[in-house]
């Protein structure tokens, strides 16, 4: 499905995952997708407990979550609190930087923002573009077209492709309407 095949409007309640705790994985020098195994911190779990009290979430029909641990742990608490069904989508993962290391990630983020989500031909770091991210999200969400309101628990860079917010805090809720 391309971006030219859109048609169904869906209310999406984006939720950024709770604060993660990377300490154990960093101590063991995990990188790449290995770092995505990080669970929520205690503060992150408290953030989700507060989030779960939001009656707005119950207006949705389903929760769709990234398969990344910090998002999935967030989604599991929200699903328990709301009673909403939970689906896990591996394609709702974090923005991809195709090189390892926190320095390379930060450089890629800077270049992504400076270049409005585009990857310049001479870029010193390779990363997923805004168009690629948006396409990945829309293709993934197409299977939920029968739902009018969906909670999507995902990651800041992915959410930013659909909302104007510069800063998206842990467990922040942002509602928008998206054509799927």
List each model region and its residues.
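Residues at the C-termini of beta-strands that transition into short coil/loop
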Residues: 16, 90-92, 177-180
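A short acidic-Thr-Gly-centered motif at the start of a beta-strand
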Residues: 2-6, 142-145
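Active-site-proximal alpha-helix that buttresses catalytic centers in soluble enzyme cores
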Residues: 3, 11-87, 172-174
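Flexible, glycine-rich phosphate/dinucleotide-binding loops
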Residues: 21, 95, 159
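Phosphate-handling substructures
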Residues: 24-25, 29, 34-39, 80-136
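Residue-level preference for short coil/turn positions at secondary-structure junctions
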Residues: 8, 59, 146-147
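Short, well-ordered beta-to-alpha junction loops that form the rim of enzyme active sites
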Residues: 65-69, 91, 153-157
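Active-site-adjacent alpha-helix immediately C-terminal to a catalytic or transition-state-stabilizing loop
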Residues: 72, 135-180
